[in-house]
């Protein structure tokens, strides 16, 4: 997922899901360096040029069937303009309908699901549209457009 950070720099964790099948997504959070505050973290920084994803800290944020890895990020790696996330959603998972004050771009690495997008840029503004997503596809969400993935 590619996502521009809000001006506050307080990026929310994206939530993606799949019902009846698993979904593996790569996420990227992009931001203008000028809008980011200097972040302090108790996390040890890993400034290695090459990192082994299988050794990176993984969290589920208390959600069964969900896995999140920050591949590179501001707190753990000191990046200023981009964060990259790798997330896995198990069968039966679904996000709430939500929106962000930033753009997002998703890359589906494995599995399939459905994107529900309520966008003012669609043919029928205000009418949510269901769009199938599957392995090797990408999709982007405009700023503030409500969306849900399952």
UniProtKB/Swiss-Prot annotation:
Glycans are attached at residue 136. Residues 1-41 form the signal peptide. Keywords: Auxin signaling pathway, Endoplasmic reticulum, Glycoprotein, Metal-binding, Receptor, Signal, Zinc. GO terms for biological process: auxin-activated signaling pathway; cytokinesis by cell plate formation; positive regulation of cell division; positive regulation of cell size; positive regulation of DNA endoreduplication; unidimensional cell growth. GO terms for molecular function: auxin binding; zinc ion binding. InterPro entries: Auxin-bd (IPR000526), RmlC-like_jellyroll (IPR014710), RmlC_Cupin_sf (IPR011051). Zn(2+) binds at residues 98, 100, 104, 147. It is found in: Endoplasmic reticulum lumen. GO terms for cellular component: endoplasmic reticulum lumen. Pfam families: Auxin_BP. PANTHER family: AUXIN-BINDING PROTEIN 1. This is probably a receptor for the plant hormone auxin. Homodimer. This is Auxin-binding protein 5. It comes from Zea mays (Maize). The gene is ABP5.
């Amino acid at each position: 997922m590619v996502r521009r950070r809000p001006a506050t720099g307080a990026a929310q964790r994206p939530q993606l899901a799949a019902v009846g099948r698993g979904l593996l997504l790569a996420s990227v959070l992009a931001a203008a360096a000028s809008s980011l505050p200097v972040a302090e973290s108790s996390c040890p920084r890993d400034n290695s040029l090459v990192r082994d994803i299988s050794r990176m800290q993984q969290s589920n944020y208390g959600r069964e069937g969900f896995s999140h890895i920050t591949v590179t990020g501001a707190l753990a790696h000191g990046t200023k303009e981009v964060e990259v996330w790798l997330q896995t959603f198990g069968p039966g998972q679904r996000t709430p309908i939500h929106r962000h004050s930033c753009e997002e771009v998703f890359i589906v690495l494995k599995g399939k699901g459905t994107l529900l997008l309520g966008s003012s840029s669609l043919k029928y503004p205000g009418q949510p549209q269901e769009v199938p997503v599957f392995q090797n596809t990408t999709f982007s969400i405009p700023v503030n457009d409500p969306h849900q993935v399952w």
